Amino acid sequence: MEQLFVDDPAFASSMSSLEADIFSGAGQLPSSPWLDLDLDDDVQDLSMAPTTANAVSSGYGSGGSGSHRKLSHNAYERDRRKQLNELYSSLRALLPDADHTKLSIPTTVSRVLKYIPELQKQVENLERKKKELTTTSTTNCKPGVLGSQLMSEGMAPIVSATCINDMEIMVQVSLLSNVAGSVLPLSKCIKVLENEGLHFISSSTSSGFGNRTFYSIHLQRSEGTINEECPAFCERLEKVVRNKAKL
């Protein structure tokens, strides 16, 4: 058939030279600019594109997660320090009034460790005094005979002085309520102790069993420290208070 068209003069005259070359097979088809494309590589590149985008997105996500963890850690650390400061403030409030000033944490812990044994000793003394009170006869005082029976059994005040530290002393006084009101009121008891070189800090009064009144007086040495003389000094305070109750 190809030969038929080529041999026909009319058909041959109507074709251009390029067309003649194509139909005659003498020439080659013009090369296409797309014939050299590797479609497999293009498909692979397109399939990898989402993976790359996901990797980039994952990178940004990882960075955001790290920043969130850092903020959470900082917030947790702030809360932890706030709780610790509140605990140390509560611990500092348990110290005597003279130590309620702003103290460093090591100083607070040191004073508390020293103060706890002193409180334990004070509790032991109070328990001992309580036992003495429970075994003491508490007969009622009759009018007109208060002075003669004041130092008799059950009538004499029970006094206990305890050193809190080198400067402070706690004095507890237990006596019959009618004696407290007429012979040794709290104001007179404080005055007696101040005459011994002590500075009044605080006090409390309570009523207990056996129609007795209890004084708890917190004092501080005005000058110097108590140190080793504490037992003798406390004994002297106890004697002074008892003697004052005789008046």
Curated annotation (Swiss-Prot):
Compartment(s): Nucleus; Cytoplasm
Segments carrying motif Nuclear localization signal: 68-75
Broad class of the protein's primary localization: nucleus
> Keywords for this entry?
Activator, Cytoplasm, DNA-binding, Ethylene signaling pathway, Iron, Nucleus, Stress response, Transcription, Transcription regulation
Does the keyword Chloroplast belong to this entry?
A: no
Q: Kindly give the Gene3D superfamilies that the UniProt entry links to this protein.
A: Helix-loop-helix DNA-binding domain
Q: What induces it?
A: Strongly induced in both roots and shoots during iron (Fe) deficiency stress. Ethylene enhances the iron deficiency-mediated induction. Induced by arsenate (AsV25 and AsV50); this induction is repressed by nitric oxide (NO). Accumulates under cadmium (Cd) stress; this induction is inhibited by the DNA methyltransferase inhibitor 5-aza-2-deoxycytidine (Aza).
Q: Show the segment(s) annotated as Basic motif.
A: 68-81
Q: Which residues form a coiled coil?
A: none
Instruction: List the disulfide bonds in this chain.
Output: none
Q: What happens when the gene is disrupted?
A: Reduced growth compared after germination. Lower mugineic acid family phytosiderophores (MAs) secretion and hypersensitivity to iron (Fe) deficiency. Reduced induction of genes involved in iron homeostasis upon iron deficiency and ethylene treatment.
Where expressed (tissues)?
A: Expressed constitutively at low levels in the roots. Also observed in flowers, developing seeds, embryos and vascular bundles.
- InterPro entries hit by this protein: bHLH_dom (IPR011598), HLH_DNA-bd_sf (IPR036638), MASH1/Ascl1a-like (IPR015660)
Q: Name one GO molecular function term.
A: DNA-binding transcription factor activity, RNA polymerase II-specific
UniProt xrefs under SUPFAM superfamilies: HLH, helix-loop-helix DNA-binding domain
What residue spans carry the region label Helix-loop-helix motif? 82-119
Query: What sequence ranges are listed for the domain bHLH?
Result: 68-119
- Superkingdom to which the source organism belongs: Eukaryota
The record's GO CC annotations read:
cytoplasm; RNA polymerase II transcription regulator complex
GO process annotations (BP)? ethylene-activated signaling pathway; positive regulation of DNA-templated transcription; positive regulation of siderophore biosynthetic process; regulation of DNA-templated transcription; regulation of ethylene-activated signaling pathway; regulation of transcription by RNA polymerase II; response to arsenic-containing substance; response to cadmium ion
Q: Which family does it belong to?
A: Belongs to the bHLH protein family.
Q: What is the purpose of this protein?
A: Transcription activator that binds to the DNA motif 5'-CACGTGG-3' in the promoter of iron (Fe) deficiency-inducible genes as well as of genes involved in iron homeostasis, thus contributing to basal tolerance to iron deficiency, iron uptake from soil and iron transport, particularly during seed maturation and germination. Promotes the accumulation of mugineic acid family phytosiderophores (MAs). Required for ethylene-mediated signaling during iron deficiency responses. Improves growth and yield, especially in calcareous soil with low iron availability.
User: Subunit notes for this chain?
Assistant: Forms homodimers. Interacts with BHLH156 in the nucleus.
Protein's name according to its UniProt entry: Protein IRON-RELATED TRANSCRIPTION FACTOR 2
